[in-house]
């Protein structure tokens, strides 16, 4: 294609008035006709429309065009549209070039139409200069392993695994903790229906364990991922439980005789568990785990285990799995409230977090569902909730809203009022964000039916009465314009969501990006909300950002659907705009290997010397290697050095 005489068609889009309201599009089209190798140039109101595309296709046939340039909006928006358009007319889709005269001209130079028009001409001249050297490229096809990996066994990961398994794909589910279930397993009820949380979750957990297409690794972590979309090799480290999962019946005799008690993490340290334990009654798998750090190896559990399931000889084990797609659903942590020193968490016994209250009010919690003060075990008569602890605080903690705190505070307040109607409850808030289906009605019900008082103002300080252990909350009521000071028996901090501690490791293992707030970054917030920048790796649930249970479940299903798109096809198409190596001049220095952000390049030995080799399925065409190569051995398809030089020359003059 590059050797034949270029015959170029140029099409200038009005984009309604987005471009034509500033840029003189007719003048730009007339200018394009003067450029070498341009056979036809037109302007049209909406080139991306069906009639606009038909004009291009007719011209390709009529004028025997072998290159097409469209001057319009961002390539991110309509480049795929026009590539498909020219391909349908028999032209290679990579013999198309786009000049962005909307974002780069009309939108940024609205106050200077004349200069915007001249700049548009420059961009068209540059695009035509590059188009003369465009080459036909062929899409790369990659075979797909029709299995998926789901990292994280919370409700979002569970939903993703079940959806994929129900579609007929084999799923590998990896959970870091001894049981799947995640945060939802800790909750008592779910808003806005106040349904029993575990009653909803437990059947899905059982479905995962029983599904013939799901292989579950609990108490395990993904430690290494190699490969690319359709062909990932995953290494999983199984931590030793010191209990044979296949032999254990979950009877609990071992825990009954174990002499060691330690704070129970599942109950947020409010209750105790044994050194051999099951996280919660509905745990899946329903087997016990020995806490190596606290076990004293007394042997009592071995003596009473009729199933002979205790195995102190277990060691960490690495297993390897081949998958075609990966869904990351590792969930979230709650923020550390000690960062807000003025609230006294960790100093005052009766200042607790919302997740601690969840465990107190839960019938399977450390108090059997009784809400009591940690200081003396008495039932609190006056309770204050403080919102936005760790959220919407750009100077001290996190700038973002955690989405769920307003709603779960109302839920907990309602549950307390149902159990103890005489309890007085105040919620100190900045703004109530009741955005979901049925949430506004839930908010109104909290006030009118349950008598919960909402005080608009962020408390400045909490102090403790040393004799009664009661807490005095000082805040400004911004609606009344008064400073209020009220005494409470218990203060609950509504803590926000933060990224998991393990997010650093997962980011490195998967080579995915994180947004400034620390959560994993999606490829596009609107158009590709569950994709990552790495093909074949998807996001689900709160690891991508704070969200409630319905949104997490929906995103789990969305991620499963996106993964299934690749798995079901049997092969995936990889864009050929990738780097290639001229092995004759490659010196094997490894600069490209070190700089490639996608791990797409490695050094291999060929004919007795080291040369770089690009895995096309991993390459994203970013051009880092081509820019850094000291010998000029790296060239990126569609952005080759000569093409870019001609484009640069075109910025100043017609290089022809």
Swiss-Prot record:
<feature type="binding site">
    <location>
        <begin position="152"/>
        <end position="175"/>
    </location>
    <ligand>
        <name>FAD</name>
    </ligand>
</feature>
<keyword id="KW-0479">Metal-binding</keyword>
<feature type="binding site">
    <location>
        <position position="254"/>
    </location>
    <ligand>
        <name>[4Fe-4S] cluster 1</name>
    </ligand>
</feature>
<protein>
    <recommendedName>
        <fullName>CoB--CoM heterodisulfide reductase iron-sulfur subunit A 2</fullName>
        <ecNumber>1.8.98.-</ecNumber>
    </recommendedName>
</protein>
<feature type="binding site">
    <location>
        <position position="629"/>
    </location>
    <ligand>
        <name>[4Fe-4S] cluster 3</name>
    </ligand>
</feature>
<dbReference type="Pfam" id="PF12838">
    <property type="entry name" value="Fer4_7"/>
</dbReference>
<feature type="domain" description="4Fe-4S ferredoxin-type 3">
    <location>
        <begin position="577"/>
        <end position="606"/>
    </location>
</feature>
<dbReference type="InterPro" id="IPR036188">
    <property type="entry name" value="FAD/NAD-bd_sf"/>
</dbReference>
<dbReference type="GO" id="GO:0015948">
    <property type="term" value="P:methanogenesis"/>
</dbReference>
<keyword id="KW-0004">4Fe-4S</keyword>
<feature type="binding site">
    <location>
        <position position="298"/>
    </location>
    <ligand>
        <name>[4Fe-4S] cluster 2</name>
    </ligand>
</feature>
<keyword id="KW-0285">Flavoprotein</keyword>
<feature type="binding site">
    <location>
        <position position="301"/>
    </location>
    <ligand>
        <name>[4Fe-4S] cluster 2</name>
    </ligand>
</feature>
<comment type="function">
    <text>Part of a complex that catalyzes the reversible reduction of CoM-S-S-CoB to the thiol-coenzymes H-S-CoM (coenzyme M) and H-S-CoB (coenzyme B).</text>
</comment>
<comment type="pathway">
    <text>Cofactor metabolism; coenzyme M-coenzyme B heterodisulfide reduction; coenzyme B and coenzyme M from coenzyme M-coenzyme B heterodisulfide: step 1/1.</text>
</comment>
<dbReference type="GO" id="GO:0046872">
    <property type="term" value="F:metal ion binding"/>
</dbReference>
<feature type="binding site">
    <location>
        <position position="589"/>
    </location>
    <ligand>
        <name>[4Fe-4S] cluster 3</name>
    </ligand>
</feature>
<feature type="binding site">
    <location>
        <position position="619"/>
    </location>
    <ligand>
        <name>[4Fe-4S] cluster 4</name>
    </ligand>
</feature>
<dbReference type="Pfam" id="PF12831">
    <property type="entry name" value="FAD_oxidored"/>
</dbReference>
<feature type="binding site">
    <location>
        <position position="622"/>
    </location>
    <ligand>
        <name>[4Fe-4S] cluster 4</name>
    </ligand>
</feature>
<feature type="binding site">
    <location>
        <position position="305"/>
    </location>
    <ligand>
        <name>[4Fe-4S] cluster 1</name>
    </ligand>
</feature>
<feature type="binding site">
    <location>
        <position position="251"/>
    </location>
    <ligand>
        <name>[4Fe-4S] cluster 1</name>
    </ligand>
</feature>
<dbReference type="InterPro" id="IPR039650">
    <property type="entry name" value="HdrA-like"/>
</dbReference>
<keyword id="KW-0484">Methanogenesis</keyword>
<feature type="domain" description="4Fe-4S ferredoxin-type 2">
    <location>
        <begin position="286"/>
        <end position="315"/>
    </location>
</feature>
<keyword id="KW-0560">Oxidoreductase</keyword>
<dbReference type="GO" id="GO:0016491">
    <property type="term" value="F:oxidoreductase activity"/>
</dbReference>
<feature type="domain" description="4Fe-4S ferredoxin-type 1">
    <location>
        <begin position="238"/>
        <end position="269"/>
    </location>
</feature>
<feature type="binding site">
    <location>
        <position position="596"/>
    </location>
    <ligand>
        <name>[4Fe-4S] cluster 4</name>
    </ligand>
</feature>
<feature type="binding site">
    <location>
        <position position="592"/>
    </location>
    <ligand>
        <name>[4Fe-4S] cluster 3</name>
    </ligand>
</feature>
<comment type="similarity">
    <text>Belongs to the HdrA family.</text>
</comment>
<comment type="subunit">
    <text>The ferredoxin:CoB-CoM heterodisulfide reductase is composed of three subunits; HdrA, HdrB and HdrC.</text>
</comment>
<dbReference type="InterPro" id="IPR017896">
    <property type="entry name" value="4Fe4S_Fe-S-bd"/>
</dbReference>
<dbReference type="Pfam" id="PF13187">
    <property type="entry name" value="Fer4_9"/>
</dbReference>
<keyword id="KW-0677">Repeat</keyword>
<keyword id="KW-0274">FAD</keyword>
<dbReference type="GO" id="GO:0051539">
    <property type="term" value="F:4 iron, 4 sulfur cluster binding"/>
</dbReference>
<dbReference type="InterPro" id="IPR017900">
    <property type="entry name" value="4Fe4S_Fe_S_CS"/>
</dbReference>
<feature type="domain" description="4Fe-4S ferredoxin-type 4">
    <location>
        <begin position="610"/>
        <end position="639"/>
    </location>
</feature>
<feature type="binding site">
    <location>
        <position position="248"/>
    </location>
    <ligand>
        <name>[4Fe-4S] cluster 1</name>
    </ligand>
</feature>
<feature type="binding site">
    <location>
        <position position="258"/>
    </location>
    <ligand>
        <name>[4Fe-4S] cluster 2</name>
    </ligand>
</feature>
<keyword id="KW-0411">Iron-sulfur</keyword>
């Amino acid at each position: 294609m590059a050797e034949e005489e270029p015959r170029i068609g140029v099409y200038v889009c009005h984009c309604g008035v987005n471009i034509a309201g500033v840029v003189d599009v007719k003048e730009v089209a007339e200018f394009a006709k003067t450029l070498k190798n341009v056979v036809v140039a037109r302007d049209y109101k909406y080139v991306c429309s069906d009639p606009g595309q038909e004009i291009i296709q007719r011209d390709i046939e009529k004028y025997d065009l072998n290159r097409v340039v469209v001057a319009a909006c961002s390539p991110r928006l309509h480049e795929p549209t026009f590539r498909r358009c020219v391909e349908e007319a028999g032209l290679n889709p990579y013999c198309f070039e786009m000049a962005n005269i909307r974002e780069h001209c009309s939108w940024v130079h609205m106050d200077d139409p004349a200069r915007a028009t001249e700049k548009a001409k420059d961009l068209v001249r540059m695009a035509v200069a590059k188009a003369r050297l465009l080459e036909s490229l062929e899409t790369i096809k990659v075979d797909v392993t029709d299995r998926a990996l789901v990292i994280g066994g919370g409700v979002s990961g569970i939903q993703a695994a079940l959806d994929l398994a129900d579609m007929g794909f084999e799923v590998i589910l990896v959970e870091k903790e001894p049981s799947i279930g995640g945060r939802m397993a800790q909750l008592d009820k779910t808003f806005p229906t106040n349904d029993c949380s575990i009653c909803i979750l437990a059947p899905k957990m059982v479905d995962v364990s029983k599904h013939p297409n799901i292989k579950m690794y609990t108490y395990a972590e993904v430690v290494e991922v190699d490969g690319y979309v359709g062909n990932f090799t995953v290494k999983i480290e199984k931590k030793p439980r010191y209990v044979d999962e296949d032999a254990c019946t979950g009877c609990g005799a071992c825990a009954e005789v174990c002499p060691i008690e330690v704070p129970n993490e599942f109950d947020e340290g409010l209750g105790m568990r044994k050194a051999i334990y099951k996280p919660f009654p509905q745990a899946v798998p329903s087997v016990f785990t020995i806490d190596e750090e606290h076990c004293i190896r007394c042997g009592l559990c071995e003596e009473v285990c009729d199933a002979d399931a205790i195995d102190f000889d277990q060691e960490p084990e690495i297993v390897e799995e081949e998958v075609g797609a990966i869904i990351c659903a590792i969930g979230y942590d709650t923020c550390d409230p000690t960062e807000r020193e003025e609230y006294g968490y960790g100093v005052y016994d009766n200042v607790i977090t919302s997740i601690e209250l969840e465990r107190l009010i839960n019938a399977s919690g450390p108090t059997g569902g009784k809400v009591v003060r940690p200081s003396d075990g008495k039932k609190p008569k006056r309770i204050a909730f403080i919102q936005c602890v760790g959220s919407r605080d750009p100077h001290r903690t996190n700038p973002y809203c955690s989405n769920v705190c307003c709603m779960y505070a109302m839920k907990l307040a309602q549950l307390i009022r149902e159990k103890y109607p005489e309890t007085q409850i105040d919620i100190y808030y900045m703004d109530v964000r009741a955005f979901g289906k049925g949430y506004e009605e839930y908010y109104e019900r909290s006030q009118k039916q349950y008598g919960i008082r909402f005080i608009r103002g962020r408390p400045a300080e909490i102090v403790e009465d040393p004799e009664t252990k009661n807490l005095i909350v000082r805040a400004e009521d911004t609606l009344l314009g008064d400073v209020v000071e009220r005494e409470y028996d218990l203060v609950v901090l509504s803590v926000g969501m933060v990224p998991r501690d393990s997010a650093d490791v997962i980011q490195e293992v998967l080579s995915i990006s994180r947004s400034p707030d620390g959560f994993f970054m999606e490829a596009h917030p609107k158009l590709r909300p569950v994709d990552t920048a790495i093909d074949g790796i998807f996001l689900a649930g709160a690891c991508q950002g704070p969200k409630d249970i319905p949104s997490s479940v929906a995103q789990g299903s969305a991620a499963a659907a996106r993964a299934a798109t690749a798995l079901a096809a049997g092969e995936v198409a990889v864009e050929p705009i990738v780097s290639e190596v001229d092995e004759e001049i490659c010196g094997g220095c490894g600069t490209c290997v070190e700089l490639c952000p996608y791990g797409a390049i490695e050094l291999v030995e060929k004919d007795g010397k080291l040369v770089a080799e690009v895995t096309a399925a991993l390459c994203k065409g970013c051009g880092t290697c081509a820019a850094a190569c000291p010998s000029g051995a790296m060239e990126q398809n569609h952005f080759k050095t000569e093409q870019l030089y001609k484009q640069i020359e075109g910025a100043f003059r017609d290089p022809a």
